[in-house]
């Protein structure tokens, strides 16, 4: 629905401006960003993604972007330059959306769309995008660009804020506790990862397994069957800036602290390095679980060293355990859990991640995530930072596991 509305608004832009909407002297960012804005408005009116979520998801995408164009590059564009800017790596359309989000926030409530319409009407009489902008919005385009840059920097570095939404059957006390725990772990995570989690997130708490599936279907625009598939074996599902949590599995206070710590660690890792190929799934899971354990220690729920002894003893006393090479992918992790049990798979991931941090230091994981961001491959980043491939480390770990019984 949003795509259809986007294209229809382009036609309206053309009609209002007498064909000047896409002229090189018009404002490219306002042409494309306003079409996305109208698409989001229509989607919301038709029961789809809300305008609020569209705005939050736009900034979520831009925070993860490895590179973006400068806003000034989206002012006047030749047809050839437009084609270049369509490459996803530039995130041109998301930045144009952000510029429109900033612009409409400056308009009186209820007048936002009318002001955009005035701009395209003004283009019918003047080919200058800047002049039409001044007529429609009561400020110079240069002034807006300056204010946008300030707004954009603030938005990109906005400290983490969680809007916790309790679905029916979830107590207000539980929702308040989740919000408190999510805020409490932020300084610890910033110390671990060398940067802080930024942005606004909606944390939707589902009451039980059935409600979890329903919440996924409602908020992720997927079918019930797809929602059921996503929910299987998951404590949470992420869709951009929206996190849906199976609150019925959060358990007591201790489990809640661990789970919220792990969840926030995952969000921060996604912010640092999201586009990943050639996964190292055991390291992904192991590290967010270690973050959860650090959160427990911070909350006075045991010492990290004691938890470490627990997983060390578990994997050393176990008979056959999966090889780390079996745990490189999400499918491999799932198959290992089905054959060996969730506990030993999780303990092995914790053991492997902790051994790596013991040898190379926690700062090595920051370097690893930066290399993942640069290279796009987790396994290549692993070789780059740790000086061995995952297969070699798997052999080293198995020797360490069996030689210390």
What are these model-derived regions, one by one?
Residues 21-101, 105-160, 275-351, 355-362, ...:
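Acidic/His/Gly-enriched intrinsically disordered linker/tail segments
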Residues 1-23, 27, 38, 128-129, ...:
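Juxtacatalytic substrate-recognition/specificity segment
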């Amino acid at each position: 629905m949003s795509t259809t509305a986007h294209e229809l608004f382009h036609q309206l832009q053309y009609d209002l401006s007498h064909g000047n909407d896409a002229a090189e002297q018009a404002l490219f960012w306002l042409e494309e960003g306003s079409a996305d804005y109208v698409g989001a408005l229509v989607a919301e009116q038709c029961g789809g993604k809300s305008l609020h979520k569209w705005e939050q998801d736009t900034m979520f995408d831009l925070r993860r972007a490895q590179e973006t164009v400068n806003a000034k590059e989206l002012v006047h564009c030749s047809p050839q330059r437009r084609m270049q800017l369509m490459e996803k790596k530039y995130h041109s359309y998301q930045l144009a959306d952000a510029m429109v989000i900033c612009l409409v926030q400056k308009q009186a409530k209820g007048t936002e769309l009318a002001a955009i319409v005035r701009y395209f009407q003004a283009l019918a009489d003047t080919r200058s995008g800047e002049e039409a902008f001044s007529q429609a919005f009561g400020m110079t385009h240069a002034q807006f660009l300056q204010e946008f840059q300030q707004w954009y920097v603030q938005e990109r570095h906005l400290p983490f804020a969680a809007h916790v939404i309790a679905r029916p059957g979830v107590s207000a006390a539980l929702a308040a506790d989740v919000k408190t725990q999510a805020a409490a772990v932020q300084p610890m995570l910033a110390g671990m990862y060398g940067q802080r989690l930024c942005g606004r997130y909606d944390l939707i708490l589902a009451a039980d397994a059935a409600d979890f599936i329903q919440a996924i279907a409602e908020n992720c625009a997927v079918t019930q069957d797809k929602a059921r598939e996503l929910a299987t074996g998951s404590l949470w599902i992420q869709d951009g800036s929206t996190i849906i949590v199976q609150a019925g599995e959060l358990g007591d206070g201790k489990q809640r602290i661990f789970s919220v710590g792990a969840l926030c660690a995952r969000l921060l890792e996604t912010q640092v390095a999201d586009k990943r190929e050639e996964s190292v799934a055991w390291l992904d899971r192991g590290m967010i679980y270690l973050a959860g354990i650090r959160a427990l220690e911070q909350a006075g729920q045991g010492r990290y060293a004691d938890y470490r002894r627990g997983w060390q003893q578990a994997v050393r006393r176990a008979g056959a355990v999966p090889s780390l090479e079996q745990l490189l992918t999400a499918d491999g992790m799932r198959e290992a859990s089905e054959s060996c049990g969730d506990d030993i798979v999780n303990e092995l991931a914790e053991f492997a991640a902790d051994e790596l941090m013991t040898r190379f230091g926690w700062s090595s994981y920051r370097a690893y995530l930066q290399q993942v961001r640069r290279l796009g491959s987790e396994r290549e980043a692993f070789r780059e930072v740790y000086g061995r491939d995952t297969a070699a480390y798997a052999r080293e770990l198995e020797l360490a596991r069996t030689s210390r019984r």
